[in-house]
């Protein structure tokens, strides 16, 4: 998908914005705090239904207004997202109302690189599950319905566990259902990582020339037994603490460099390079399966990678023939790293000029 036009209304510090980006490389310049990252944030919203920055949706609404609208048009789709101060959300696809954000998100495959992306490798498992599940969601159609069913079952069982009102026979039903969907989710993740690792190893050779890298799945339970048996063996613990302690919701991935977890093997600078390779690997895998590129959002590239890896990333992005949005203080920092001249935009006081 390529965004042909992007319109923002009362989003962050923008009143009204209409943008016609290049289908290739776009560089957005401006001082810190000018709003250039907010432009990336609006595109991200179309692919995820939320911001990648801290805070709730009300912070996205320009002060003094009742809501914001983000609208984009591509060759095949017209997509609009509106959120109001009362929490109401409105989604539009080709002029019709849609109920589920997943129906919109599936059409807008967005890959994001920010200074905080390295936290995927350093922080808790939640961000790593989001990383892998983005990929599975976009290439395995049944994954979303499996995940919705699993999370609903998990919520119901946890509620009963907290209330201390879960008879043995009824609990068996919840565990059987959780095991069924949880193992389907885990198999989808395993298949995805098996395919993704080929791309990771290729890109690691380019970005980390002396490092061999791969990603391994930790399913969320001891896989020497079935998930049902694992749930059975943790029943007393679950009743004691009031939540389900094993399952697909406890999964994690281990990113390994030369046989050691990356956070114990690589320097801070190398970790930034490693997450860049992982994100590009996801994008390349998506492009191979879906036969169309992702949209890449890169915030503050020059502060994250050294000059050599900046040039390498820019070359990789250009070779993908993808639509790319990159923020920088000045265009001179990046424009010479692309073979073809990128389209330049400048943000100042909530106004974008080409």
From Swiss-Prot:
Q: Check the record and name the SUPFAM superfamilies matching this protein.
A: P-loop containing nucleoside triphosphate hydrolases
Residues folding into a coiled coil are none
Its cellular-component GO annotations read: cytoplasm
Record's keyword terms, sorted? ATP-binding, Cytoplasm, DNA damage, DNA repair, DNA replication, DNA-binding, Nucleotide-binding, SOS response
Q: What is its main location?
A: cytoplasm
Record's superkingdom? Bacteria
Pfam families membership: SMC_N
Listed GO MF terms: ATP binding; single-stranded DNA binding
Query: Which amino acids does the record list as binding ATP?
Result: 30-37
**Any keyword Iron?**
no
GO BP, one annotated term? DNA synthesis involved in DNA repair
Is DNA damage among this UniProt entry's keywords? yes
**Matching PROSITE patterns, A to Z?**
RECF_1 (PS00617)
Localization recorded for this chain is: Cytoplasm
Sequence intervals crossing the membrane: none
The family classification in the record reads:
Belongs to the RecF family.
What function is annotated for this protein?
The RecF protein is involved in DNA metabolism; it is required for DNA replication and normal SOS inducibility. RecF binds preferentially to single-stranded, linear DNA. It also seems to bind ATP.
Any idea what this protein is called? DNA replication and repair protein RecF
The gene from which this protein is expressed is recF
């Amino acid at each position: 998908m390529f965004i042909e036009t992007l319109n923002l209304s009362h989003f962050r510090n923008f009143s009204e914005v209409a943008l016609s980006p290049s289908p290739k490389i776009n560089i957005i310049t401006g001082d810190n705090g000018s709003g250039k990252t907010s432009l990336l944030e609006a595109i991200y919203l179309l692919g995820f239904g939320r911001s990648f920055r801290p805070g709730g949706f009300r912070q996205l609404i320009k002060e003094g207004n009742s809501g914001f609208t983000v609208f984009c048009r591509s060759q095949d789709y017209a997509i609009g997202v509106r959120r109001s101060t009362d929490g109401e959300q409105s989604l539009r696809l080709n002029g019709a109302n849609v109920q589920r954000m997943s129906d919109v998100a599936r059409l807008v495959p967005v890959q994001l690189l920010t200074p905080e992306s390295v936290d995927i490798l350093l922080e808790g498992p939640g961000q790593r599950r989001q990383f892998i599940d983005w990929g599975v969601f976009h290439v395995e159609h049944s994954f979303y319905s499996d995940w919705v069913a699993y999370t609903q079952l998990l919520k119901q069982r946890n509620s009963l566990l907290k209330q201390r009102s879960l008879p043995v026979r009824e609990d068996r039903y919840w565990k059987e259902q959780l095991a069924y969907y949880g193992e389907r989710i885990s198999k989808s993740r395993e298949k995805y990582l098996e395919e993704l690792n080929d791309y990771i190893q290729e890109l690691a050779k380019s970005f980390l020339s002396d490092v061999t890298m791969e990603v391994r799945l930790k399913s969320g339970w001891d896989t020497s037994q079935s998930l049902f048996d694992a749930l059975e063996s943790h029943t007393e613990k679950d009743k004691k603490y009031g939540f389900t302690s094993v399952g697909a919701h406890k999964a994690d991935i281990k990113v390994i460099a030369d046989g050691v977890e990356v956070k114990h093997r690589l320097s801070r600078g190398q970790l930034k390079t490693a997450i860049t390779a992982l994100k590009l690997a996801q994008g390349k895998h998506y492009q191979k399966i879906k036969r169309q590129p992702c949209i890449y959002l890169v915030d503050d590239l020059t502060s994250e990678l050294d000059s050599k890896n900046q040039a390498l990333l820019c070359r990789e992005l250009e070779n993908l023939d993808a639509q790319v949005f990159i923020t920088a203080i000045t265009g001179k920092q990046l424009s010479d790293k692309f073979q073809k001249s990128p389209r330049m935009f400048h943000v100042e006081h909530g106004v974008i000029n080409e």
